[in-house]
Amino acid sequence: MASTNDLKNGLVLKLDGGQLWSVVEFQHVKPGKGPAFVRTKLKNVLSGKVVDKTFNAGVKVETATIDKRDMQFSYMDGEYFVFMDMDTYDQLMVDRKSVGDAANFLIEGFTATVAQHEGEVLFVELPAAVELVIQETEPGVQGDRSTGGTKPATLETGHQIQVPLFITTGEKIKVDTRTSDYLGRVNS
Protein backbone atom coordinates (compact mmCIF):
# COMPACT_ATOMS: atom_id res chain seq x y z
CA MET A 1 0.00 0.00 0.00
CA ALA A 2 1.14 3.50 -0.82
CA SER A 3 -0.28 6.95 -0.34
CA THR A 4 -1.38 9.01 -3.34
CA ASN A 5 1.25 11.51 -2.17
CA ASP A 6 3.91 8.88 -3.06
CA LEU A 7 2.79 8.40 -6.69
CA LYS A 8 5.46 8.58 -9.39
CA ASN A 9 5.67 7.76 -13.09
CA GLY A 10 5.98 4.03 -13.78
CA LEU A 11 4.45 2.94 -10.46
CA VAL A 12 1.94 0.11 -10.98
CA LEU A 13 -1.33 0.26 -9.05
CA LYS A 14 -3.94 -2.45 -8.45
CA LEU A 15 -7.36 -0.86 -8.98
CA ASP A 16 -10.87 -1.79 -10.12
CA GLY A 17 -10.93 -5.35 -8.82
CA GLY A 18 -7.29 -6.28 -9.35
CA GLN A 19 -6.60 -4.66 -12.74
CA LEU A 20 -3.05 -3.36 -13.12
CA TRP A 21 -2.60 0.32 -14.05
CA SER A 22 0.71 2.09 -14.64
CA VAL A 23 1.03 5.78 -13.71
CA VAL A 24 1.86 7.74 -16.88
CA GLU A 25 1.40 11.26 -15.48
CA PHE A 26 0.44 12.71 -12.12
CA GLN A 27 -0.11 16.18 -10.69
CA HIS A 28 -0.69 17.26 -7.09
CA VAL A 29 -3.35 20.00 -7.04
CA LYS A 30 -4.08 22.29 -4.09
CA PRO A 31 -7.05 24.45 -5.04
CA GLY A 32 -7.68 27.73 -3.24
CA LYS A 33 -10.85 26.30 -1.78
CA GLY A 34 -11.38 22.67 -0.84
CA PRO A 35 -9.12 19.69 -0.17
CA ALA A 36 -5.99 18.82 -2.15
CA PHE A 37 -6.19 16.05 -4.74
CA VAL A 38 -3.99 14.14 -7.18
CA ARG A 39 -4.88 14.12 -10.88
CA THR A 40 -3.41 11.09 -12.73
CA LYS A 41 -3.27 9.57 -16.16
CA LEU A 42 -3.19 5.76 -15.89
CA LYS A 43 -2.46 3.13 -18.55
CA ASN A 44 -3.88 -0.39 -18.28
CA VAL A 45 -0.90 -2.76 -18.33
CA LEU A 46 -2.74 -5.48 -20.29
CA SER A 47 -4.97 -3.57 -22.72
CA GLY A 48 -3.00 -0.33 -23.11
CA LYS A 49 -6.15 1.74 -22.47
CA VAL A 50 -5.39 5.18 -20.97
CA VAL A 51 -7.77 6.84 -18.47
CA ASP A 52 -7.76 9.96 -16.30
CA LYS A 53 -8.41 9.33 -12.61
CA THR A 54 -8.51 11.71 -9.66
CA PHE A 55 -7.63 10.67 -6.09
CA ASN A 56 -8.01 12.61 -2.85
CA ALA A 57 -4.61 13.52 -1.41
CA GLY A 58 -3.30 11.08 1.19
CA VAL A 59 -5.61 8.19 0.21
CA LYS A 60 -4.02 4.72 0.34
CA VAL A 61 -3.80 2.79 -2.95
CA GLU A 62 -2.63 -0.77 -3.51
CA THR A 63 0.59 -1.14 -5.48
CA ALA A 64 1.69 -4.14 -7.52
CA THR A 65 5.17 -5.46 -8.20
CA ILE A 66 6.03 -6.32 -11.78
CA ASP A 67 9.05 -8.56 -12.27
CA LYS A 68 10.88 -7.69 -15.52
CA ARG A 69 13.53 -10.12 -16.74
CA ASP A 70 15.69 -10.24 -19.85
CA MET A 71 15.07 -13.55 -21.60
CA GLN A 72 16.22 -15.02 -24.89
CA PHE A 73 13.66 -16.17 -27.45
CA SER A 74 14.49 -19.81 -28.21
CA TYR A 75 11.83 -21.24 -30.53
CA MET A 76 8.12 -21.57 -31.35
CA ASP A 77 6.18 -24.51 -29.93
CA GLY A 78 2.84 -24.47 -31.72
CA GLU A 79 1.11 -21.24 -30.65
CA TYR A 80 3.59 -20.64 -27.81
CA PHE A 81 6.82 -18.68 -27.80
CA VAL A 82 9.52 -20.34 -25.68
CA PHE A 83 11.87 -17.98 -23.83
CA MET A 84 14.94 -18.96 -21.80
CA ASP A 85 16.05 -17.15 -18.65
CA MET A 86 19.70 -16.23 -19.23
CA ASP A 87 20.63 -16.67 -15.55
CA THR A 88 18.86 -19.89 -14.55
CA TYR A 89 18.36 -21.43 -18.04
CA ASP A 90 14.71 -22.08 -17.11
CA GLN A 91 12.31 -22.10 -20.05
CA LEU A 92 9.07 -20.13 -20.09
CA MET A 93 6.22 -20.70 -22.55
CA VAL A 94 4.37 -17.48 -23.46
CA ASP A 95 1.14 -17.37 -25.47
CA ARG A 96 0.75 -15.19 -28.58
CA LYS A 97 -1.61 -12.75 -26.82
CA SER A 98 0.99 -11.90 -24.17
CA VAL A 99 3.73 -11.48 -26.79
CA GLY A 100 1.53 -9.05 -28.77
CA ASP A 101 3.11 -7.03 -31.58
CA ALA A 102 6.60 -8.11 -30.47
CA ALA A 103 5.90 -11.36 -32.38
CA ASN A 104 6.44 -9.43 -35.63
CA PHE A 105 10.10 -8.88 -34.79
CA LEU A 106 11.17 -12.01 -32.85
CA ILE A 107 13.76 -14.35 -34.31
CA GLU A 108 15.68 -17.07 -32.50
CA GLY A 109 18.36 -15.65 -30.23
CA PHE A 110 16.76 -12.21 -29.70
CA THR A 111 16.76 -10.92 -26.14
CA ALA A 112 13.46 -9.48 -24.91
CA THR A 113 12.16 -8.22 -21.56
CA VAL A 114 9.40 -10.45 -20.16
CA ALA A 115 7.18 -8.77 -17.54
CA GLN A 116 5.42 -10.97 -14.98
CA HIS A 117 3.07 -10.36 -12.06
CA GLU A 118 2.52 -13.20 -9.57
CA GLY A 119 3.87 -15.73 -12.09
CA GLU A 120 1.58 -14.60 -14.93
CA VAL A 121 3.20 -13.14 -18.06
CA LEU A 122 1.78 -9.68 -18.74
CA PHE A 123 3.71 -8.61 -21.84
CA VAL A 124 6.93 -8.98 -23.80
CA GLU A 125 8.95 -5.85 -24.54
CA LEU A 126 11.58 -5.52 -27.26
CA PRO A 127 14.27 -2.85 -27.60
CA ALA A 128 13.09 0.28 -29.46
CA ALA A 129 14.94 -0.84 -32.60
CA VAL A 130 16.00 -4.24 -33.96
CA GLU A 131 18.13 -5.34 -36.90
CA LEU A 132 16.48 -7.71 -39.37
CA VAL A 133 17.16 -9.00 -42.89
CA ILE A 134 14.86 -8.25 -45.83
CA GLN A 135 13.60 -11.64 -47.02
CA GLU A 136 11.73 -10.40 -50.07
CA THR A 137 11.08 -7.11 -51.86
CA GLU A 138 10.52 -6.01 -55.43
CA PRO A 139 13.27 -4.10 -57.20
CA GLY A 140 12.78 -0.33 -57.03
CA VAL A 141 11.83 1.26 -60.35
CA GLN A 142 13.59 4.53 -61.16
CA GLY A 143 11.08 7.39 -61.24
CA ASP A 144 8.29 5.47 -59.42
CA ARG A 145 7.06 8.04 -56.91
CA SER A 146 3.37 7.12 -56.79
CA THR A 147 3.96 5.43 -53.41
CA GLY A 148 5.98 8.28 -51.92
CA GLY A 149 9.33 6.61 -52.52
CA THR A 150 8.57 3.43 -50.58
CA LYS A 151 7.71 -0.16 -51.41
CA PRO A 152 6.54 -3.18 -49.37
CA ALA A 153 9.16 -5.56 -48.02
CA THR A 154 8.89 -8.81 -46.07
CA LEU A 155 11.24 -9.22 -43.10
CA GLU A 156 12.83 -12.53 -42.08
CA THR A 157 10.08 -12.85 -39.46
CA GLY A 158 7.38 -12.69 -42.15
CA HIS A 159 6.20 -9.21 -41.10
CA GLN A 160 5.65 -6.66 -43.90
CA ILE A 161 6.84 -3.05 -43.67
CA GLN A 162 7.43 -0.13 -46.04
CA VAL A 163 11.05 0.54 -47.07
CA PRO A 164 12.71 3.05 -49.43
CA LEU A 165 13.02 2.08 -53.11
CA PHE A 166 16.81 1.56 -52.91
CA ILE A 167 16.56 -1.34 -50.40
CA THR A 168 17.10 -4.81 -51.93
CA THR A 169 16.45 -8.40 -50.86
CA GLY A 170 19.07 -9.71 -48.41
CA GLU A 171 19.96 -6.33 -46.90
CA LYS A 172 20.06 -5.90 -43.13
CA ILE A 173 18.00 -2.95 -41.89
CA LYS A 174 17.06 -1.33 -38.58
CA VAL A 175 13.33 -1.30 -37.74
CA ASP A 176 11.43 0.60 -35.01
CA THR A 177 9.55 -2.07 -33.00
CA ARG A 178 6.89 0.38 -31.77
CA THR A 179 5.81 1.73 -35.17
CA SER A 180 7.19 -0.82 -37.71
CA ASP A 181 9.00 2.05 -39.44
CA TYR A 182 12.22 1.64 -41.43
CA LEU A 183 15.06 3.43 -39.59
CA GLY A 184 18.06 2.79 -41.84
CA ARG A 185 20.55 0.34 -43.25
CA VAL A 186 22.92 -1.56 -40.99
CA ASN A 187 26.57 -1.20 -41.97
CA SER A 188 28.19 -4.64 -42.08
Curated annotation (Swiss-Prot):
Pfam families with a match to the protein in the record: EFP (PF01132), EFP_N (PF08207), Elong-fact-P_C (PF09285)
Pathway: Protein biosynthesis; polypeptide chain elongation
Name this polypeptide is given: Elongation factor P
Function description: Involved in peptide bond synthesis. Stimulates efficient translation and peptide-bond synthesis on native or reconstituted 70S ribosomes in vitro. Probably functions indirectly by altering the affinity of the ribosome for aminoacyl-tRNA, thus increasing their reactivity as acceptors for peptidyl transferase.
Primary location group: cytoplasm
GO CC term (a single one): cytoplasm
Organism name: Streptomyces avermitilis (strain ATCC 31267 / DSM 46492 / JCM 5070 / NBRC 14893 / NCIMB 12804 / NRRL 8165 / MA-4680)
Keyword Protein biosynthesis assigned: yes
Gene that this sequence comes from: efp
GO biological process, one term: peptide biosynthetic process
UniProt subcellular location: Cytoplasm
